C-alpha cells in the first residue's frame, strides 16, 4: 500500500512523507523514479549537481541497456545507434554485429551522458516525480539500523523506501556499511572527446591488447565510441589487479592509446580535458531495513568491460517494482533477485580480473579471446553484458564453467598477485 504524501514538523525539522526517496539522479536513480511514479508512487529524487550536468563516462550503451531504455519508453532519437563491436587483440581484428535474440535488441548506441541523463530525468518529472537539484541528501538511520528516509537542508523526507543511487561508493554508502569489499578488484578509467571523420561508424571499437608507454600489457582496454555528432569518445580503463597499478598514470596511458589510433581515426585535438573516474565492482551490502543500493552503488559493474548503465537501469526498475508490490519485503526480495540474476556472472568477472592480472596469462588469453569467430562471439556476449544466470547457449555454458573453474584457483590467484 502506498503512502499518502503529507508534511509536518518534528523537533523543528520540517518533514514530508513520500513513498520513495532516491539519492542520485543518474540512470539507475532515474529508472526507479520513472517506474515508480508512472504507477502512482510519490517519489522525490535528490541530485547534488545541477540539471544537465555532465557525467564522465564512455557513453556506450549495450543492447541490454537499449532494451532497458525501451522498457522505460525512452526514445533514442538523440543517440547514435551502434550495430556491433570491433575487437582488437594485437594484429587480430574481429568485427561482429550484436546478436539477434529474443531477449535484447540487436543494436546498442552511443549517447553522451549529459543528454542521456537529462532525457531520463525529464521522463521522471513527466511521470510525476519531484527532482531536487544541487542538494545533498543523507539517510536518516534509527538506532535499530532502519533507514526511514533522508534529511537535507533542515528538511526531512520520511520514505517507505530509500534508494541509494549515488554512483561509486562514497559517504552515503559508508554510512550504511555499503562500501566496496576491500580485497575485491575495482577499475579506473579516463576519457576525452576528439573530432573524427569516422564519427558515424556503426561499431564500437575495443583494443583488448592495451599497453602503456613502455610496452607493458595492461589488464583493461582502450575504446573508440563514435558519437555520430562529429566526435568520438576515446578512453582507456585498467583493473586494480595489475602489477604496479598504484603507479599507473592514466593520462599517459590515454596518450599512448591515442597515439596508437591517431591515424586510423584521423583524430583532431582533444575537445576537452581528459577526466577520470572509479569503477566499483563489489559492495559489502546492497540492502537493509528500509533501503536498497542500485547500479554502481551496489557494485553492479561488469569487471570485464567496466559497463554498468544497463545493470543500473534494470536494478532501478526492479527496486521500484518490488516496492510497488510489497514495500515491507522489497529490500530483501531485491537483494535476492539481484543476486540470482547477476552475482554468478559478476563474481566470475572479478575472479577473471585476478587471472589476467598475471602478465604471463594476460597475453595468451587476449589472443585466445578473438582467435576464432566462435570464441569471439562469446567474448562479444561478455563485453556486451549479454550474459547472466539465464543466458542459454555457448556463452552461458562457458560462463558457468568459468565460474566453477576460477572458483577453484581463485585463492591461489589472489595470493600470487603482483604488488599493486
Spans of features found by a protein language model:
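A short, basic/flexible loop-to-alpha-helix module at the beginning of a structural domain
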Residues: 2-17, 296
Amino acid at each position: 500500500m502506498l503512502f499518502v504524501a503529507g508534511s509536518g514538523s518534528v523537533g523543528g525539522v520540517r518533514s514530508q512523507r513520500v513513498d520513495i526517496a532516491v539519492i542520485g539522479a543518474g540512470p539507475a536513480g532515474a529508472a526507479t523514479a520513472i517506474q515508480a511514479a508512472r504507477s502512482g508512487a510519490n517519489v522525490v529524487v535528490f541530485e547534488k549537481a545541477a540539471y544537465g550536468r555532465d557525467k564522465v563516462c564512455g557513453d556506450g550503451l549495450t543492447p541490454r541497456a537499449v532494451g532497458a531504455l525501451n522498457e522505460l519508453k525512452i526514445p533514442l532519437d538523440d543517440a547514435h545507434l551502434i550495430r556491433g563491436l570491433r575487437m582488437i587483440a594485437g594484429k587480430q581484428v574481429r568485427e561482429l554485429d550484436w546478436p539477434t535474440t529474443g531477449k535484447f535488441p540487436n543494436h546498442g548506441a552511443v549517447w553522451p551522458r549529459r543528454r542521456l541523463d537529462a532525457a531520463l530525468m525529464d521522463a521522471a518529472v513527466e511521470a510525476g516525480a519531484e527532482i531536487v537539484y544541487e542538494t545533498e541528501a543523507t539517510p536518516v538511520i534509527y538506532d535499530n539500523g532502519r533507514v526511514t528516509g533522508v534529511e537535507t537542508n533542515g528538511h526531512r523526507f520520511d520514505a517507505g523506501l530509500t534508494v541509494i543511487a549515488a554512483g561509486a561508493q562514497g559517504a552515503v554508502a559508508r554510512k550504511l556499511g555499503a562500501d566496496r569489499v576491500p580485497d575485491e578488484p575495482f577499475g579506473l578509467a579516463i576519457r576525452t572527446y576528439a573530432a573524427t571523420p569516422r564519427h558515424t561508424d556503426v561499431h564500437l571499437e575495443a583494443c583488448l591488447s592495451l599497453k602503456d608507454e613502455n610496452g607493458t600489457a595492461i589488464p583493461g582496454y582502450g575504446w573508440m565510441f563514435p558519437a555520430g555528432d562529429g566526435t568520438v569518445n576515446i578512453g582507456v580503463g585498467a583493473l586494480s589487479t595489475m602489477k604496479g597499478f598504484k603507479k599507473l598514470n592514466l593520462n599517459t596511458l590515454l596518450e599512448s592509446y591515442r597515439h596508437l589510433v591517431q591515424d586510423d581515426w584521423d583524430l583532431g585535438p582533444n575537445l576537452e580535458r581528459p577526466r577520470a573516474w572509479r569503477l566499483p565492482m563489489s559492495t559489502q551490502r546492497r540492502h537493509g531495513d528500509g533501503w536498497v543500493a542500485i547500479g554502481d552503488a551496489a557494485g553492479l559493474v561488469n569487471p570485464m568491460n567496466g559497463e554498468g548503465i544497463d545493470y543500473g537501469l534494470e536494478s532501478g526498475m526492479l527496486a521500484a517494482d518490488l516496492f510497488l508490490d510489497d514495500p515491507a519485503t522489497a529490500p530483501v526480495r531485491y537483494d535476492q533477485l539481484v543476486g540470482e540474476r547477476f552475482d554468478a556472472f559478476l563474481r566470475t568477472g572479478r575472479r577473471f580480473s585476478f587471472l589476467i592480472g598475471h602478465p604471463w596469462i594476460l597475453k595468451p588469453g587476449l589472443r585466445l579471446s578473438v582467435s576464432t569467430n566462435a570464441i569471439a562471439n562469446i567474448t562479444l556476449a561478455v563485453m556486451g553484458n549479454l550474459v547472466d544466470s539465464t543466458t542459454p547457449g555457448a556463452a552461458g555454458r562457458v560462463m558457468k564453467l568459468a565460474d566453477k573453474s576460477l572458483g577453484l584457483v581463485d585463492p591461489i590467484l589472489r595470493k600470487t598477485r603482483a604488488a599493486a
